[in-house]
Amino acid sequence: MYKTMKATHYIYVLFAALFTLVCAGCEDRLNIEKHGSLGGPENYYQTDEEAEAAVASMLISWRDMYSNWFYVKNCLSDDAYTGGGSRGDNAMMEQLNEFTFFTDNGLISGLYSGLYAVVYKANLIIENVTGDSSVMRRAVAEAKFYRAWAYFELVTLWGNAPLVDHLLTPSEYHVSNSTPEALWAFVEQNLEEAISSGALPSKANVDDADATSRVTLETAKAYLGKAYLFQGKYSDAATVLDEVIDSKKYELYQGSFDMLGHAVTNNCSESMLEVQRRKNSEQAWNQFVQFYIMLGWRTSHMSYGPKALFEEGIAMGTYGFFNPTKSLYDAFVEREGVDGYRLKSTMRTYEQMNEVEMAINPGLYLVGNEGYFFWKTRLLGSDNIIDQSWFQSLQYTNLRVMRYAEVLLMAAEAHVMGGGSADKAVKYINEIRTRAKLAPLSSVTLDDVKKEKRLELCLESVRFQDLVRWGDAKAVLGEQGKFIPAYGYFPKIDPSTGEVMKDAQGNPIFEFKLEPENTKNSVYGFQDKHMLLPIPYTELNVNPNIKQNTGW
């Protein structure tokens, strides 16, 4: 199996090689037309069209690192087991999920280099697009936003990553570590400059999907608020996040909750930031990303009845990674009960899967599974770019990065922790709960925020960094990976002989069950060193000025 999409760009890559590689095939990634021919930096970036092409190239790099971004952050959380077809199906994901990874983990190195590829493309725009047209000023503002976005991930995951604020000359390639303080200041500066530039538009109204396909003023403010929140600047966070909310340009999607991760809600009223996709059959394979294949259930191990295929429209040809944990299910039940609307829209029990004619095939079992299945990330045939029953993973669902629900939850936390408006904290949380068909709360604590955020945004790439900043990671993740469950059909063992029982024809007898300790690991769980990810060894090998994070 193809296991990872590794970026190979480093912060010291030569301009010519990288620029030539990524400036082709941009038209279908965003609503940006690309015209003209490529030249060197001395005669490029002179027109609006060239500025837009440079933005499209930056967004291709952003798209290309998305899968690694999603895998790393969600494997490190307690929302899901790795899953897959068998133990070892994707060893790098298992290492992350069980905290047994080292400096050579390909997903970590792919994310690290992918983030710096985005930084490099942003630096190209910021330094070379110098015109004063509205298109060029917007290009620079967007570049500053994405540079800040990349450094938010670098500082929260690596802490001491190198700060590259300009295009490097050969003598500067060996950049040394920065500090969290310097990186946070850089994130704030870039977002503040993007916001104050006047070049980022606001949506015309909550349903303005065209504006949502690009970075808006409110999106930049949302990320500035997030940066403040992570630094404990609660009053500042509350102020800027309130501005996003008070703009009334965004609202929670009021359709079916289980469609929030599907094409019908691309750039909807709740969308803050998404990697754009296009339903263009001529560009279908050019838009292929591994992400969708990984999320769907394990087609080879399961049967799909007519109800699943035709009434629910479930897509086939997927690999079955990311199975929800019982811990996540129990958290839902505690908050909503076993019949909770948001629970059933997010995940299903095996019995509920049977109701839609989904079943594990006799003689097979699912590794990293406790009998629960994500429903919110199910693949649908209606989301396919092209209609082909044998392979339904060419989806045009936008890749979600932030939605408005996260803004409400962050704002509530900022008010609670900063001694701000208790009424606003209650109002924001109750907007989330009302959509989830839950009774409103009369007061809100940090514990309420934590619980609501886990349920609302599970498997949406926020949980691990939240656990770390809250100081909860060791308590929550310390035992993760000790046991890996499996669910399905297992050979029935004769307790008196220890041998597999057989029927009259000599065939093995299977029993359907959960094996909670199908795999037992001697090394597992979050340790102090996992507060920061390791700098990839590939970077250490080529840059003598980088020092490794503590414990690695």
Regions found by a protein language model. Give the residues of each.
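TPR-repeat structural position
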Residues: Y234, S421-A422
